[in-house]
Every structure is written in C-alpha cells, then in structure tokens.
Amino acid sequence: MTGRVPFLLALLMLAGPAWAEHPAECRVAANLIEPDFPLPQVVRALAAKRLSILVIGSGSMLLPGADGSKNAYPARLQHALTEMLPGVEVKVVTDVQAHRNAVETVKALKPALAAAKPAPALVVWGIGTVDAIQAIDPDQFSHALDHGINIVHSAGADVVLINAQYSPRTESMIALGTYAEHIRWVALQQKVPLFDRFSIMKLWADLGTFDLYSATKKLDIAERVHDCIARLLADLVIEAAKLDEPHAESGR
C-alpha cells in the first residue's frame, strides 16, 4: 500500500470539505455531518482506487415512479462520490425492501454482502422508520443493530448508520425520536459513524428550506431532498476517511 499513500492523501485533500460548494438549500452546519469515527476499510478501498458501497434498508430509501431508483439518494451518492474522488471507481448497489424492519434487515445482510460484487468496503444502513411504525421493542431494535453491525464488520466492511427521515406529518404519531436516540447510542458504542438524517431534515423543516408537509405529494421536493442527502452523506464518508489518514500512512 506504500506506493498508494501519496495518491490517497492527495485525493482526500482534494475531496473536501465540500459542503460549502453544495446548492444553498443543501447546506447545513458542519457539525451535523462531522463523523465521530473513521472508516478504515473505505481508506483501503480509496487507496486501491475502487470503492464499493452497499446501501441496505427499507423502501424509504428510494423514490416512487419509473425513475425512482435513478433519482433516489443511493444513485446520487454514487454520482457525488465519483465527482469528489477523481481516479476512483465508485459503485453503489442497493438491497432495499418495503416495510423491512431491523431484524429483517439483519437476516438479509449476509446474502446481500455475498451478492454484492465487488465486495463492499462500506455498508450504508438506513434504519428506524419501519421499526417506529411497527412499534418494535426498543431493546430488540438495539440488539438487532448491534448484531447487524457485527455481521458487517466480520465481512470486512465499514458501516454508516442512517436514521429515519423526519416528517412533520407523522412526528406526533410515530416515536421516531425514540428510535433515533437508540441508533445514536448503538453508533457510539460500536464506534461507527452516524448520518443524522432526522436532525438534518428537521432543521430544513424548521427553517422552511423544504416544505416537508407536501414532500410526499410533490416528487420534485422529494428528489431535491434526496439530492441533498446524497451530497451530505458523501461529505461524511470523505471526512470519516480523513480521520484514518495516519493509519493509511502506516500501511494499515
């Protein structure tokens, strides 16, 4: 890996921070997307100039319509990272199923990891919405998260957790905040980065950046939200990789 280190360090310096260059509606305070933990497997993948990502979760990760998968944030994440990482081949694949909760996602993890080619260096796990709707026991939910993260790490990949979407229409009916706190706690205990989609979208709603009351009815708003999520998630991945730069120099 020694010969790749100069390329890697130059690449990460070139890649960010990029949130100031995003469309104005996408910009948020830097602390909302600053990772607490590194992504060592992503660093190795960048050094090899080939980054494969598996996005797994429920149907909320995609958009409706014939072009839904193309316009949703997983596809946009691939585009954003490709732009930010010149010289790196980026591939994002999805394993998404409607109404899939945490326990069901854990059962799907091993087959999804085995099916993804090349083997993913990173798993982006969107979680919380379905569990909140189904009122899954929070302890069972946390246990499933722990188990799933261990499966991914055993397969040689990093994990980024993404909590639920914020929706002012359902906030009073579904305890999304409760599950968001459990996700945050598990992320801290497991030392994995958390992309706090819930807080970011709540900020947008509070500021009037996006009319999230009508987002379910207006596809153009949903597409813009997904575009911003992809851009900010790409930033988090890059920043988390930078946290592991000393290990890259030592050949970890």
Give the predicted meaning of each segment:
Residues 22-29, 60, 94-100, 124-134, ...:
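Cell-envelope and extracellular/periplasmic
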Residues 52-57, 91-96, 121-127, 158-163, ...:
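Structural recognition of the beta-strand scaffold that forms the well-ordered cores
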Residues 22-94, 111-117:
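Serine-esterase "nucleophile elbow" of acetyl-processing enzymes
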